[in-house]
């Protein structure tokens, strides 16, 4: 395979963003798919050799087992090219794996005598569904979950750091009851952790039961053997969950569930990106800058929230693909059609854009600094938010029309100051201790349990 320059790559994942998503290449490149197919074919061959009921093939020697294992661990780009050259003749990618294995092991007497047990009773989808199952499972466990955990840890760290930093909340874009910066970040840490936990426990299913899922060829060769039990053991030893009821293809319901889980996490992350973008726009966050960088080709002053915008854009692409995968993969005509094959090849693309969005979001989070002066200015100009606790205390003591009186005082009014609020409190028929408690309230300290909630996240 010739080296592809990022400058001429069709996909930006293999071009501009190559270095950001390279961790997925061992799982979703063409070479990775071929290697996983080789792995499954070899493991099936070895499993058959260890089964006493299949008398025509005996357990392989340690040297032969080592040779097989080396084919998997040392599988190279050159090996992949050899497989592709065979595929060019056969026009069948999985059959090319079988022929390549026979060629590579032709000089091994043990193997050559029983070479026809390679791909024994298998349909291509037996090999493919297990290969993709391993690719999807391992990419989740070794790449995607750690990347998501990095974001969660960044959010938890900032939530703790900013737990006591009050801010003016906004509902419908308008000033609302204060919170703290830390608590608002803690919300996303909590949401993403729930998504992480759900994603981590999704079992990927696999099958190896022949052309239409009934073990027809298996039973034709060995009619008294318990092929279902043998197949279940094989699938589970690979680390997948066995699906006993399939057509030619594994139904992909578990992969659809996984895609939905990724898409849901991405939707949460999209919400985070947009909220942070908004806080930067309000001036609540500043971004650390590098002197050498440029924010605009014409406006020298610009420091744009490009990391969150990049993340948002890639999340949109990722979710479009993930939703299509989720909706399309469980649907196949009768005992199968081939539409899932080309769609599954884009699993890595969907996760590539997802991983890129994770990287960009986390990069942006690590640039953030709270702009305490700007946040304080907003709070100092929003004494009307204390209408809520005042009318609530009035309700406690049975004062008439508390909500309506505070509405008349504050709604749509300008110039609501500390003095206006304190004058109103002074005229209330409530105990002096309550008046003092209300006078002690400010937009800065009327934050409820926000600080405590922020400090508790991640514990």
Predicted segments with their positions:
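A helix-coil-helix interface module used to build multimeric assemblies
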Residues: 2-218, 222-233, 295, 308-310, ...
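Glycine-rich cofactor/substrate-binding loops
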Residues: 2-35, 86-87, 91, 283-285, ...
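Amphipathic alpha-helices that form helix-helix packing interfaces
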Residues: 41-47, 104, 151, 155-158, ...
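A structural signal for small-residue-enriched, beta-sheet-centric alpha/beta enzyme cores
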Residues: 124, 219-222, 231, 237, ...
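Amphipathic alpha-helical coiled-coil segments and their boundaries
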Residues: 136-137, 144, 185, 251, ...
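Conserved helix-loop functional segments at active or binding sites
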Residues: 161-165, 198-201, 205, 236, ...
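Short, well-ordered beta-strand elements within core beta-sheets of diverse protein domains
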Residues: 183, 256-264, 389-396
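Acidic, glycine-rich loop-and-beta core segments that form the ion-binding/anion-interacting portion
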Residues: 222-319
């Amino acid at each position: 395979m010739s080296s592809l320059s990022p400058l001429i790559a069709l996909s930006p994942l293999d071009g501009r963003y190559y270095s950001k998503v390279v961790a997925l290449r061992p799982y979703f490149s063409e070479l990775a798919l071929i290697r996983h197919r080789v792995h499954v074919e070899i493991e099936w061959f070895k499993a058959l050799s260890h089964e006493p009921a299949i008398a025509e093939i005996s357990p392989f020697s340690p040297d032969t087992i080592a040779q097989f294992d080396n084919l998997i661990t040392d599988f190279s780009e050159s090996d992949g090219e050899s497989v592709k050259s065979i595929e060019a003749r056969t026009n069948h990618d999985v059959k090319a794996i079988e022929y390549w294995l026979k060629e590579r092991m032709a000089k091994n007497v043990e193997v050559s005598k029983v070479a026809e047990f390679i791909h024994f009773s298998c349909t291509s989808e037996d090999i493919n569904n297990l290969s993709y199952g391993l690719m999807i499972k391992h990419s989740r466990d070794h790449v995607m979950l750690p990347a998501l955990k990095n974001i969660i840890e960044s959010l938890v760290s900032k939530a703790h750091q900013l737990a006591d930093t009050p801010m003016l909340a906004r509902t419908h874009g308008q000033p609302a009851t204060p919170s703290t910066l830390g608590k608002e970040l803690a919300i996303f840490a909590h949401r993403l952790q729930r998504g992480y936990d759900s994603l981590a426990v999704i079992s990927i299913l696999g099958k190896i039961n022949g052309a239409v899922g009934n073990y027809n060829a298996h039973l034709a060769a060995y009619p008294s053997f318990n092929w279902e039990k043998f197949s279940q053991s094989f699938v589970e030893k690979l680390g997948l969950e066995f699906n006993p009821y399939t057509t030619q293809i594994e139904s992909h319901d578990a992969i659809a569930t996984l895609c939905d889980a990724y898409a849901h996490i991405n939707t949460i992350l999209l919400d985070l990106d947009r909220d942070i973008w908004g806080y930067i726009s309000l001036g609540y966050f500043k971004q650390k800058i590098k002197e050498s960088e440029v924010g605009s080709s014409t406006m020298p002053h610009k420091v744009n929230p490009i990391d969150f915008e990049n993340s948002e854009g890639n999340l949109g692409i990722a979710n479009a693909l993930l939703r299509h995968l989720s909706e399309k993969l469980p649907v196949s005509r009768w005992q199968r059609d081939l539409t899932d094959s080309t769609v599954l090849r884009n699993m890595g693309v969907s996760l590539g854009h997802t991983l890129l969005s994770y990287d960009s979001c986390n990069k942006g989070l690590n640039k953030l600094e709270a702009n305490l002066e700007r946040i304080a200015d907003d709070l100092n100009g929003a004494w009307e938010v204390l209408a809520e606790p005042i009318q609530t205390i009035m309700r406690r003591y049975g004062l008439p029309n508390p909500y309506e009186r505070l509405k008349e005082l504050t709604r749509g009014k300008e110039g609501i100051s500390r003095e206006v609020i304190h004058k109103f409190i002074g005229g209330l028929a409530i105990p002096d201790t309550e008046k003092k408690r209300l006078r002690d309230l400010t937009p800065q300290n009327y934050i409820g349990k926000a600080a405590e909630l922020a400090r508790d996240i991640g514990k």
